[in-house]
Amino acid sequence: IKQEIDNASFPPILIPDTIAWENYKAVLNSNRFTTYFFNSLIVTGSATLFALLVGVPAGYGIARMQAHKSTIVILIARITPGLSYLIPLFLLFQWVGMLGTLWPQIIIHLVVTVPIVIWIMIGYFETTPMELEEAAVIDGATRWQVFRHVAFPIAKPGIAVAFILAIIFSWNNFVFGIVLASRGTRTLPVAVYNMISFDQLSWGPLAAAALIVTLPVLLLTVFAQRQIVAGLTDGAVKGG
């Protein structure tokens, strides 16, 4: 919100007299920034959707089968640094000719989002009551029907938490984008980084771009917080 001259003033100016809206206009009027914004939407949305489709049933199956060894595998996948498998996947994507598209980023984001979703859903399904599922089985429901009509509705608060965390981890990911993305498939964190140059650094547009990148996830968390807390509270009361 500061003019460029205010950023270097001494003593520092915390709140300027006039807000520099031109910083935001300069960022939003950039065609490349709009492209990067839609790239982030596609990558984050696809990675989150696929992670939920895989992670929720997987978490339910592991929790109900009490497959503790599988839980250890999920934990190892969760704590493994992304750089350890970035170079092998880069060579694989280069070999199959996928570089220059959004698919490499979507696939490698799944390596991050799927373990998060599975880990959260395992913990949530382990705390949900079994009585309703047992009653459905006695009534003749199949395992899939029990999951779809009984376990899934109860687990909606946990799914909401997994959904938000998957979005946050995918949206803010920087390393995968800067390595796998081409000029036309970069995401917003990479776009903000590319605004830093050796000869000149405009703090106003850079800060405006950083705020625009952070704002969607921040708003999503704020608006969904009440529903998540209310759902978790209801689930705890029913489970007790």
Regions found by a protein language model. Give the residues of each.
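A hydrophobic, multi-pass inner-membrane permease signature
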Residues: 1-240
